[in-house]
Amino acid sequence: IWNLFLGDLFMQKSTTELLNELKNFDSFKEYEKINKNSMINKTLSQYLCDLLEEKHLKKSDVIRKGELNESYAYQMFSGVKSTPSKDKLICLSIGMDLSVDETNSLLKLAGLSPLYPRIKRDSIIIINMNNKKSVVEINEELYNEGEETLN
C-alpha cells in the first residue's frame, strides 16, 4: 500500500529522468505538458495528513512518539507551520515510523536537504532510524558523539 501511495505522490518517472528531460526543454510550459503527472501537487500538510491516513496513525500518537511540542506539531499538520525545521520533520518521521527513504522524501517535499550518509550527524540518525530507535535514544547517541540533538 505504501508503495502505491508513494507512486501516487511522485508518479513513475525518477528524479534523475526528470532532470535529464529538463535539459531538452526551452520553456517550463512545454515540460509541464509532458510531465504534469510527475509533478508534486500536495502541500506538506496535505502529505502529512495523507501519511497518517495511509499508515492508520493518530496525530496524538505520532506527536508523542516523535517527542514534539503539541502545538507546534499540530501547526505542521494544519499547514500553519509550512516550513518546519529538518529536525522537527525527522522527529515526526520517527513518530510515524517512516523509513529513511520515506523521511528523505518528506524532507525534499519540504524543501530541505535529505539525510546524507557522509555527514556524521546524519549518519548517526540514519543508523538509529534503521534500527527503529526512539527520538530519546537517537538524541542520547547524538549527544554522546558531540553532535546537536534533534530537540
For each feature predicted by the language model, list its residue ranges.
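Recognition helix of helix-turn-helix/homeodomain-like DNA-binding domains
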Residues: 67-84, 109-111
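DNA major-groove recognition helix of helix-turn-helix/homeodomain DNA-binding modules
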Residues: 87-102
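Short amphipathic recognition helices of helix-turn-helix/homeodomain-type DNA-binding modules
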Residues: 102-132, 146-147
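The alpha-helix within a helix-turn-helix
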Residues: 52, 63, 93
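A short, Lys/Arg-rich alpha-helix, primarily the initiator
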Residues: 25-59, 136-150
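Key DNA-contact positions within bacterial/archaeal DNA-binding proteins
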Residues: 60, 71, 101
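N-terminal flexible/basic segments that precede or flank functional cores
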Residues: 1-43
